[in-house]
């Protein structure tokens, strides 16, 4: 497929939602939520992951659909934000938010995590038997999204951070970054929240990475305004410091996630259509 020589990538006949960037061997894989807006006034319906690749963050090559959605009766009727992780030589996994408004608990639509696999970062297949839901004990069932999975080298296991809400945390300050752990990327256990500042409704699109001697936690909120925040700590155990200016860019650039080539780290986000 042809290249687009422009900084602000936009597919034909659709809109870009949250981005899920991944870097390997000179290429940035910019997975994104592909919103076709098939019904006037409706947003994020029949959303799937599509892919654009770039070597310089200027020229993008559109690669088409990466992960297909499920049927109307499946949890992944819509596919939302997640992350990509490599395991082994050519074994990749994408963990993503699955959402179907018709699947409800106590009258409310629930979110869950599903998983897809690939051997080339282009072609993906969802594991229909994998479905990970909130424990409904520490965390509410209704906000359980945006899984960010990474290898904790010190512990020798995998960690998953999620946009979640503490059970009984209140309507306006219950938002937290949930923590789950696994040794095999299949079986996961819920742990106490990774970060729970009691400041936001929810904390979307969490991500953590190390740069220099600091760890950075990135997340996005809409409590007071649409923006992406970051926190800093010397270890993953915290304490997480709040910088004086703790936001990325402006409200027009939302849900920022990053990818690094080992030397530089680039931020990817979506810009509002109006």
Describe the residue ranges of each PLM region.
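Anionic-ligand-binding alpha/beta catalytic cores of soluble enzymes and soluble regulatory domains
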Residues: 258
